[in-house]
């Protein structure tokens, strides 16, 4: 029920986006008002002209003909202008919404996107936003204009032939009420369509990403059948939605027919002569915008699910809120301290009062069995999340520690770099991927980072060197090459704290040793935390910390921990 309540107000919640486009919204309203008013005036004058010619056998004079021509031209111009302005407004708003959705996802990442399929996220960022085009282009300004035209036309009709309002007002009330009565059924069908579209999008993206594996294991036929099933589900949802719209349109048409019959019967007893056709045309003309508005409101009701998804993304809370008063960081090397840190994923506790200190310039290996919380520590150091309790601090050589929560985003990202095992590459050149974090880095810094990570040798083997396109997610490169590029990208920012989350896991022993040896250059100027499983990587660290059950249970050098045994020995035993 709470979800339904959220969807019920979802479209209304997206109206404030128009605040930044007030001038264009007003112009769109004026154009829609001119369009609808010109139509009512044209229909009424045409009916009066025909009535005069038939009843009084009097041909229209030059003034009437001129007025008709002016109204035709005005209607054509107003229609064109309204369509131009309304779609211009809608696409500007959609462009802004896409940015807001992306900002919301980025602000709440990775908590909000963890476990969600990339196709589903793409559907929210693109498909759901695109679906709202109808709402902004055909509903908002047009509804306001319809209300003004109906009100003005009703006043005019009351002054000329008030009896004709008797059939018009009840039908107008029913037309206005119809979208409210059908809103729940339409919203359910609209939500089903959007969910089916998101599922199909997610399946398609996963199929393309895993095409090689599907071919290798002979699973493509089964996957193709899954895509067909999702396609059928989407088709059925769309047919159900269209059938509902057809039924709603039939009800609206029936109400208009009732109004026509009522107006004809009322006019037969109250209006005589050449004014009869004009009075009936005016009565039905003021009803037409109401019928169009009812249709627009009905269709907009089917967009509530899309609006709710977009609104949820736009208003997503920050996973790591910005500080009200950011603190500056002192110059020089920085150590790291996790003090009494607790963290959980929902109802699953991962870290339970963890305490860990890494001295400035030290390289510490973080080890433990799978699920011990090593990667969670890396994510907390990057402030992808904040701890449930406790603090993650940067500790200068002299002076008080600085909580990550007190750092401005640019200062944090320029100080701490995290490289994961599967750091993604983008569909661009090798150079563009390297410069992602430091686009203004000079040539010397670029060359140095590439040399340290061994990317210069990768570039030498590529057809266009650093100008070679690496493909989406770096699919043209090996896992080891991608790891080296991700490492070089991080080094290019010249971080004072470097966190390697199994970065060299995809490298062979020789490659791992080469990267580790390269990282010793300038190691005293930065603090390095290495999440590792490979014994050779652990052995090269200055110190080792062993995690078990969400806490640090052992610390020391390789030799000290080997001699001590305990949890460290159990970790090594599992690695063979």
Regions inferred by a protein language model and the residue ranges of each:
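Membrane-integrated ABC transporters
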Residues: 1-39, 60-64, 86, 131, ...
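An intracellular "coupling" helix at the cytosolic face of ABC transporter transmembrane type-1 domains
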Residues: 15-24, 110, 129-136, 140, ...
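Transmembrane helix-loop-helix hairpins at lipid-water interfaces of multipass membrane proteins
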Residues: 19-78, 163, 397
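Transmembrane helices of ABC transporter permease
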Residues: 20, 25-33, 48, 141-192, ...
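Helix-loop-helix
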Residues: 52-57, 156-168, 247-308, 313-317
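Cytoplasmic coupling helices
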Residues: 86-103, 141-144, 167-212, 219, ...
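ABC transporter TMD-NBD coupling linker
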Residues: 283-347, 386-388, 393, 441-449, ...
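ABC-family ATPase nucleotide-binding domain "signature/switch" substructure
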Residues: 376, 414-417, 433, 449-453, ...
